Amino acid sequence: YGFSMELIKNVKDVIITPLTKLINLCIQNKTFPKCLKTGIVIPVFKKGEINDKSNYRPISLLPVFSKILEKVLCIQLTKFFEDNKILVKNQFGFRKGCSTSDALLSFIDQISEVFESGNYCIATYLDLTKAFDLVSHETLIRKLYVYNIHPDSCRIISSFLTERFQRVSLKGTTSSDLPVSRGVPQGSVLGPLLFLIFFNDFPIELNENNVILFADDTTISTTDKNCYEILTRNQRAISKASDWLCSNGLALNEGKSVNMLFSLKKSPNLANLTLLPNIQTTTRFLGITIDDKLLWKEHGVILAKQLSKNTFMLRSLANQVSQEVLKIAFSSLIQCFLRYGILIWGHASCRHYLFSIQRRAIRIVAGLPY
């Protein structure tokens, strides 16, 4: 908030020298300016009952000059962690060259190996409660020192995190400032990287298991030939994960965490596996519906409903906008949904029906009979 980024870009030649001096002074003094540490939170309605506050998503706006200074710090900190290969390979979130598709491919490759070897695999999808908002500043700074970050850098990051405030703005009314004592600042440039650093040692605690991370989306997989042994190993892994989360001040929502058993064996003896809480045959993971046999039927059904709905929207637009606008709408309403994760599910039988919906949408854009 404050000045727009467009305005800053237009006057960059005028302000570049004083702005550079200010940024260098902040770095030399190991201090993040107090005037840049107040966020404006705007509640954005999602869906459901309009008077239910849980149906609103808080969007935090920060001063534009805060983001410029953060970007300078973020570039240097990222370079240090990437050059020294400190960030674990299990983490796919907020990293250059990594995406949700990479995380999904890594997970599916592992399940495919389980199927080929005739083993069992229990995948536990952990639901963390407000992980970004519960990060302990003291613990994070301690971890920066452990990773040999220079004390001066630790001080300015500590200054960035502490003595922060936020105010809520809604329909022209603004609340008083409230202190923020935990968490990485929402809407910040530096926040996502600091969360990755905070969470970086989590997979190390579970070295016997395969851990896939996309920021705070966490999946722990346990593989074994014996259906009794796998339960013991899975429970041991979840216990370790819970201990790590507790010691780091984070909370696990056990009621929303999901367990899935992957196996191609026809009649496995699963008597003990009934002890697993919330065991399901399908679940939603990084925008893809995964089933325990990797047949993708459920994903195909959900995607077909979405594409059919969007095709109807496209047809409603056809007589009201130009073909160029229709092409843009086709890209956002059809193609982006169809392409997402297609490397994973594209071989499944559901693709034929999904592509037929796409053909109908193409005919609408081309002005051909539906």
Q: Which sequence ranges carry the predicted segments?
A:
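Short, conserved micro-motifs composed of acidic
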Residues: 236, 250-283
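Basic, alpha-helical interaction scaffolds
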Residues: 277-344
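Hydrophobic packing residues in well-ordered alpha-helices of helical domains and bundles
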Residues: 104, 211, 231-234, 238, ...
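A glycine-rich phosphate-binding loop feature that marks nucleotide/adenosyl-phosphate handling sites
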Residues: 40, 253-265, 331, 351, ...
